[in-house]
Amino acid sequence: KYSEQTINDPVKTVLESPVVKEQTFIIKGKNYIAEVSNVGGGSIVSYALTKHLKKSESSLNLIDGYNSNNLVVSFVNQSGEIISLDKSWSLVSGGSANLSETNPEVSFLFTTEHLGRQVTKELFFYFDSYEIDISTSLRSLKDVSLDEKYTLSWVGGLPEHEGTQDAMFMEGLISQVGNIESFRVGAAGFFGSSSSSNIDAEEKRYVGQADFAGYRTKYFGLFFIPQKSDLVEITKYPTPLRAGVDIGITQDINLEKNKLYLGPLDYSSVENLGVGLEEKILGWQWLSSVSWLVYSIMISLYGFIPNYGVVVVLFAILIKLVTYPLMAKQLRSSKKM
C-alpha cells in the first residue's frame, strides 16, 4: 500500500511571481473564528477555536508562523518541474461573514493564471462545523501537466499546545481500504519531549486511494478527505520550536473535490466525517465498545448537568453503585475464609 523513503534533496520548484496585494477575510462560526488570505488561493492565516478551551484561554489558534502557508496547489509540468501556485490569486466572490443558523455557510472563489490559463479554487465554511470543502480546478492546464494530476498541500502541521504531552500523541494518520496506518512524529518514550531535536526528517508515500489522511496532536487534528487520491505524501521534519508536518494529496486533475477537517478531536465532530476516523479516537479496537458506552453515558449526563467536573463525580458514583453487589459478595466470601 505504501513505500517508505528518507527525504532527499528537494525537487526544483518553480513559483509564480507575486503581483496581487494580499487581502484577508474573517469568518465567524459557532465555535471558531477563521481568517483567510487570497495568497495561496485561500490560505488559512488564523483559525482560533472558541470552544474546548482551558479556563485561562479566551481562544486557541491552530495556525502559527510555521503552517500559515497552507492549502497550496501545485502540479508537475512537462519539464518535470513542480509548479507551485502559491501567489497571484485574486478574490472573485465572497467576503467576511458572521455565520449563524439562518446564514449557515459562506464560500470564497479565488482565481489565478498560469501561462495565461485560468485556475480556480473555492472554499466553503460552515456555521456549526469544523469542515471546510475545497474545490480546485486546473483543467485548463491538463495539456501542460506531465501526468494530468495536481497536489493540494498542508504545510507545517499544527502548533503544540500541551507541551511534552503532545509528543506522545503526535502522528500522521492515513486510512486505506478501512485500515488506519500511523506515522509517528513525536518522541516514543512516555516521558519523551517534543523538542525538534528529537525529530528526524522523514517522508512516507502512500500509493492509492485514501479514505482520509492527516496529522494529529493530543487534542487537535487536520485531515483531508479526498475525492479519490492517487498518492499521499506525509513528511515530518524539525523546526526551531516544534515538529513540522506536511500533508500532500495528489489526485487526477479532473477530480476537483477535497474536504479538510481542522479542529478538535471531538468524537461527534469527527464521526460526522463518515470515514472511520472516530475509531482512532476511541483507541484499541477491543476497547471501542467500552469507550463508546462511557462516552454515551457522560454525554447524556452532561445534557442534564452542563459541568464535566460534576459529571465525572456522578459517573464515579454510578460505577460504584453498579459494582457494589459484586464487591459486597467478594467481601462476604473473604470474611468466611
Residue ranges and their predicted role:
Residues 2-25:
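Short, Gly/Pro- and small/polar-rich lid/capping loops
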Residues 19-280:
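Soluble non-transmembrane domains of integral membrane proteins
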Residues 269-311:
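Cytosolic-side membrane-insertion boundary helix
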Residues 298-301, 318, 322:
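Alpha-helical membrane-inserting segments
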Residues 319-337:
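Membrane-interface amphipathic helices and adjacent TM-edge segments
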